Amino acid sequence: MNTPLAHTPPMGWNSWNTFGWNINEELIKTVADYFVESGLKDAGYEYIVIDDCWSEKQRDENGRLVPDINKFPNGIKPVADYIHSKGLKFGIYSCAGTHTCAGYPGSFEHEFDDAETFAEWGVDYLKYDYCYKPKCADGENLYKRMAMALRNCGRDIVFSACNWGNDGVLNWIRESGAHLFRSTGDIQDNWLSIQSIVESQLTHEAYSGVYCHNDMDMLVVGMHGKGDNAEVLGKVVGGCTDTEYKTHFALWAMKNSPLMIGCDVRKMTPETKEILTNADIIAINQDTECRGPYCIRQWNNPEKVFALVKPLCGGDYAIGMFNFSDKKSEMSLQFFDIGLPTSSGRGLELYDCHAHEILGTYTERYAAQIESHDCLVFRAKVVKL
């Protein structure tokens, strides 16, 4: 109990993006089965998280949360036990307000009781949303309350704070006790949403680190317009190309965001599975130093191309070159900007994390043509010439 949790960004699956309120015991168990059978577990994904709409609309006579008898007729603990039997971990959802975002009971003024309930059920991860916040309470206090409750519930539970970047969260979230925190609004399954989130995060590197990770929201990789978050104001606007999903995943990995899958893993295409299980990209995300990347080309340049560079444990560097423009663009990466002057007598050996091969050793610069909405990601090793 109270062992260090989430040294690196959590990896797993959340039910909301695809299923919304339409969840049940059979579905969650089947997802756990597919985690094992598809290789997702072996790739490092471990949390199966039930989002909103899992409970009854009212608490019981003792003020305790009650699972929806139609969705979870055997309760929550047997589901958690089943997931644990697969060598995975189980997560659940609640809210800092009086109600959840979908109108179910929230944890306001029930924080310690709910934390104990979650511990009794075998919960390993809590996503804690921010709807129906009482006017008398501020976000910092609400998240500190649940953090304290979880730290005293008798079980180690990863605490995912989801207040969408409100109330100056960057200034207080680390000391609150949360292990990850949302600093953006909800993601949608479309390229414009991904681009907007990335734009909002280019100055947030300093706020994320070991044991407290900046959550850029769940992944939409592989959704292809099918799911609960594919609509905006009733209109279907969802779906990205596999190239865009590849870039989306690479950016989340480079930025140390938790990697929480949102698609229906039972129906993954080979392309989706290849993106989500790319061991070289995942290794960048799970690097134990958890250092944020720095941007060496500014976002607002006319071509909308930029590069991120991230120091890795052992002396290597992750380098991502991204083209957010609507046309093919040439990008030149000057090694001087990374910190490698010509006078050093050294170059960079570049390993392509998508082709899974060494490209060669380069001096001073590397240039490439990058397709629209595509990316190149390298693991770079400094070598003597």
Predicted segments — roles?
Residues 10-15, 44-50, 89-94, 124-129, ...:
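Structural recognition of the beta-strand scaffold that forms the well-ordered cores
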Residues 16-18, 53, 95-99, 131-133, ...:
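Active-site beta-loop-alpha junctions enriched in small/polar residues
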Residues 31-136:
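Aromatic-lined carbohydrate-binding/catalytic grooves of carbohydrate-active enzymes
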Residues 110-113, 152, 158-264:
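Glycan-recognition surfaces
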Residues 246, 252-255, 260-262, 300-342:
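Carbohydrate-binding surface patches
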Residues 247-299:
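Catalytic cores of secreted or luminal carbohydrate-active enzymes
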Residues 337-355:
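Solvent-exposed beta-hairpin/edge-strand motifs
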Residues 360-385:
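C-terminal beta-strand-rich structural cap/linker in extracellular carbohydrate-active enzymes
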